[in-house]
Structure formats: structure tokens, C-alpha cells
Amino acid sequence: IIGLVLGYFEGLTDAIGARLLDTLMAFPFIVLVTMTLVAIGPSNLTVILVIGIAYAPLVARTVRAAVREQKQRDYVSAARLGGEGALAIMFLEILPNIRETILIELVTRLGYAFFSIATLSFLGLGIQPPSADWGLAVADGYGFLTGGKWWVVLFNSGAIVSLVMATNLIAQGIGAFENSDA
């Protein structure tokens, strides 16, 4: 919704919102998430919320760009001339036309979120025991590397990589499916 509003309304709203998004995106992701989790304390819900909030500016920026592109189209001008208000144009006209972009962005970020959760769990800041997490499993198996038992880490790491790759392939598939309809 933030990206939708910033993309539709130009001027001061867009300028302030875009600079705020740029500021949030300027912080290194892992540093921002780590500092927040250290300050708040790790729990399953906290980890998910912090990662979701950390990825929100990236999604908002993508949606903003898509809205700005769609806003120049004739169907938006026709809706304005037809007397539709800003909310109706944003939610009934523009939003359905950028659903593919939003869906691809969300699925891609979901894969990155899985990797981020595993990374934080490996560092001891993510999902906490006794909850099951691949990052915790990699951290537990890390000590076995010196004993020559590399497969303990390999299979769990491979599962993480496979999940991230699968979400990226799903996002590409969504894009290919949507583009084949056009």
C-alpha cells in the first residue's frame, strides 16, 4: 500500500516517502536485522516480523515504480475523466494491472527471507531451539566438519539453497505465465 500511494501521488508525499525508503534501504540488511533482534530479543514471531519489515522498503520501491509507469497509461486518464477518485483508480484500476509485478516481488523476497532466517538462526539470533530450523541444524553440524563429517552440514545447507532456488523459479514461472497471457 505504501508503494501504491507513493507511486500515485507526486510532489511532497512522493519525495519524502521515496527518501525515507532510500534511507531504510541504505542500511545493510543483516546489520539492521541483527541490531533490531539484539535490541528486542529473538523469538519466532519477532524474527518473522523484523525480516518482513526489513524487506518492506524493497517491495514498496518496486510497487512505486510499477504504479508510476501504469499511471501514464490511457486507462488511468480515462478513469480520471470518468470521475473516479484517487482511491478507486489506485485499487480498482492500477492495482489489478500490477499484480504480476507484486506477486513476483513477494515470492522472490520470500526466498530471500527463508535464507535470512536460516542465516540468523545459524548466528544464534533467529529461530531459537527447540524449534526446528535449517540454520540451527547447520550450526549444530558445524562442529562435525573438523571430524570429516561434512555431510551433516551439506544436506541442511543444500535444503536451504534448494528452497531459495525453488522460490526464485516459482517467481520466474509466474512471470512467464503472466507474459504468455499478454
Description of each model-found segment:
Residues I2, G7-E69:
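Generic hydrophobic transmembrane alpha-helix motif, especially the helices
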Residues L4, V33-V38, V47, I51, ...:
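Transmembrane alpha-helix boundary and packing residues in multipass membrane permease domains
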Residues Y8-F9, A78-N97, V138:
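Short helix-to-coil transition segments within interhelical loops
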Residues Y8-L12, A39-G41, G83, V107, ...:
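Helix-loop interface residues and adjacent transmembrane-helix termini in multi-pass membrane transporters
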Residues L12-L20, I94, W134-A137, G141, ...:
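Hydrophobic alpha-helical segments of integral membrane proteins
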Residues M25, T36-A39, A66-V67, S116-F155, ...:
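Glycine-rich helix-loop "coupling/hinge" segments at transmembrane-helix boundaries
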Residues I51-A54, E100, I104-T108, K149-A182:
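C-terminal transmembrane helix and the adjacent membrane-cytosol boundary/short C-terminal tail
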Residues L87-L120, T167:
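Transmembrane alpha-helices
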